[in-house]
């Protein structure tokens, strides 16, 4: 059996886009996450929390969005999700899937 070496392990430590996985683990946000976050901040200016996570390994195919905003007050969950979908209408065309979690800030 051959001894372990960093060079031999390098192919195993590469993510979907060829970036080392440890870069993704310690990076703050991907370009796609930043873009989606910025759009949501513009569309929901009263949001108290927005978290966008690329759950497709960094390739931008699937995102999880958690957003807390007063704009959702007195709206059913399906209406809240429709608002998020409408805000991201153009970006969704390039995605495989989207998980949305919405809430109203607690007082």
UniProtKB/Swiss-Prot annotation:
Protein location: Mitochondrion
Cross-referenced InterPro entries? BolA, BolA-like_sf, Mt_Fe-S_assembly_factor
Q: Name one Pfam family in it.
A: BolA
Q: In which tissues is it expressed?
A: Widely expressed.
Q: Which UniProt keywords apply?
A: Disease variant, Mitochondrion, Primary mitochondrial disease
List cellular component terms (GO): cytosol; iron-sulfur cluster assembly complex; mitochondrial matrix; mitochondrion; nuclear body
NAD is among the record's keywords: no
Does the keyword Calcium belong to this entry? no
The record's Gene Ontology biological-process terms are: adaptive thermogenesis; cell redox homeostasis; energy homeostasis; glucose metabolic process; intracellular iron ion homeostasis; iron-sulfur cluster assembly; response to lipoic acid
Associated clinical condition? Multiple mitochondrial dysfunctions syndrome 2 with hyperglycinemia: A severe disorder of systemic energy metabolism, resulting in weakness, respiratory failure, lack of neurologic development, lactic acidosis, hyperglycinemia and early death. Some patients show failure to thrive, pulmonary hypertension, hypotonia and irritability. Biochemical features include severe combined deficiency of the 2-oxoacid dehydrogenases, defective lipoic acid synthesis and reduction in activity of mitochondrial respiratory chain complexes.
Q: What does this protein do?
A: Acts as a mitochondrial iron-sulfur (Fe-S) cluster assembly factor that facilitates (Fe-S) cluster insertion into a subset of mitochondrial proteins. Probably acts together with NFU1.
How would you summarize the oligomeric state and partners of this protein?
Answer: Interacts with NFU1.
Homology family? Belongs to the BolA/IbaG family.
Record protein name field = BolA-like protein 3
- Source organism of the structure: Homo sapiens
Cite the source lineage: Eukaryota, Metazoa, Chordata, Craniata, Vertebrata
């Amino acid at each position: 059996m051959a001894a372990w070496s960093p060079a031999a392990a390098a192919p195993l430590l590469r993510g979907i886009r060829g970036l080392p996985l440890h870069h993704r683990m310690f990076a703050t946000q991907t370009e796609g996450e930043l873009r989606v976050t910025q759009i949501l901040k513009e569309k929901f200016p009263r949001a108290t929390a927005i978290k966008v996570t690329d759950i497709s390994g960094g390739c931008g195919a699937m995102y999880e969005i958690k957003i807390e905003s007063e704009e959702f007050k007195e709206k059913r969950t399906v209406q809240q999700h429709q608002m998020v979908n409408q805000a991201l209408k153009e970006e969704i065309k390039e995605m495989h899937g989207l998980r949305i979690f919405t809430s109203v800030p607690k007082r």
